[in-house]
Amino acid sequence: MTNSPIASKAVPCRRIGTGPLHHFFGYYNKSNWDASGRYLLANQVPMMDADLTPDLVAEVGFFDLHDSDSYFSLGQTTAWNWQMGCQLQWLDGMPGHQFIYNVRTANKASFYPGFGSCIYNVDTKQVRQLPLPIYVAAPNSRYALCVDYRRLYITHETIGYGEHGPPRAMPHAPGDDGIHYMDLASGESHLLLSYRSLREFHPRVSMDRAIHWVSHIEINPASSRILFLHRWTERVKDETCFLHRLITVNPDGTDMRLLECSDHPLPQLADDFDPSAVGTFDYEKSEYQISHPLWMDDSHIIVWGPHNGEIHYHLYEDSEGGEVRVIGRDVLTENGHMTFSPTNKRWLLSDTYPDAATSQRILFLFDMESGLRHDLGSFYTDPDLRKENRCDLHPRWSRDGNQACIDSVHELQRQMYVLDVSHIVGTGGRTAVASNTRIFDKF
């Protein structure tokens, strides 16, 4: 393997959808293609950018890739944000074509009053409402994990849902809230892990006066193991003050393991520190950041974060004291949204945050066997977009491993694009592309 091998590859890229409306999916952690490859989930909104309010509506639906990429709106939601959308995801373990997403409800008796989720059956057009908003559904579609998005709105506004009026006061580490387990067939739920139990698990002094929350909850392919980031801070308005731990646990709450902790001194807590001086992406590029963990398989986790004094893409074995391996030491040198191909773990799809000078972001594939990085394109983003309304690429794989889908604003609209990477990954069966396909290196 040579040092810093990077190749540029021109790949077919086409925009999905036409007209004046805007489309996006949100996060990188799940495919928005259905199992057949025909339907591509997306939210539709009338604007590229807006401050989110509890009344702002997003359409919920999909593009039919077998019907001239026509968009079909199948519902609406006001429980969404620009980063994660409404947590749209296919339920592959259920019969037919079914997907789930978050909504606001009139149910004031639920554990999180006013919030829930819906399952939409594409084949029967039936909608079934569930009492909790989900963060992620298990691959077997038997259960989902749920959190309070009102807490996230206070601790990490970018991924939360707001309410009318001022934010409510939140206890720092309550014993009656945390990660909830919800059965997707019955809607029954119970508390899986409380914030108090997380604070008491290998406690740190920095936790004592901090507010706690969880994010990046992910379930392994076998639906038998859960990972999440436990975060805490005394200054929610300054993300560089966030502290992080990577933890795994069984779906019944047993066998909790601490894989990494980036607790560190925080000079930002000084009274004279100015959080407004922190750049939009300084937090994402922090040397202490643990972010974007995802299962490679049932027992290994890829993540950007520090280990033994160095920050890299790291591959963790899911065991305390297990092997931790640096991935792409001289090639993958900054934070990104990474996922492995669903058909060949040789291929890692990821991106970068915008370059401070050019506002360009790189989309790339990394070859785990050769160590070669294939840059697929460079996409401009408006530097005036803030943390809460930015548009990360958030690349997602198609089910056959031949294509990637991204969100982007490089054409001054928030839209989705599909890139054909089949000639790089060597899976064959190149997908025919529409007339608006462009071969590109930079936008």
Each predicted region: which residue ranges?
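Blade-loop segments of beta-propeller domains
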Residues: 22-30, 47, 53-106, 134
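Short, conserved, GDST-rich strand-edge loop motifs in beta-rich repeat architectures
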Residues: 43-57, 101-112, 147-176, 228-244, ...
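Blade-terminus and WD-like Trp-Asp/Gly-His loop motifs, strongest in beta-propeller folds
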Residues: 30-41, 80-105, 135-143, 147-148, ...
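Loop/turn-rich, solvent-exposed surfaces of beta-rich toroidal or solenoidal domains
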Residues: 289-291, 296-312, 328-374
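Surface-exposed loop and turn segments in beta-propeller and other repeat-based domains
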Residues: 14-23, 73-82, 189-210, 260-286, ...
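Beta-propeller blade signature
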Residues: 57-67, 114-123, 173-186, 242-254, ...
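Blade-level signature of beta-propeller repeat domains, shared across WD40, Kelch, NHL, RCC1
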Residues: 389-443
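Asp-box/WD-like beta-propeller blade repeats and closely related beta-sheet repeat scaffolds
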Residues: 79-93, 100-178, 191-209
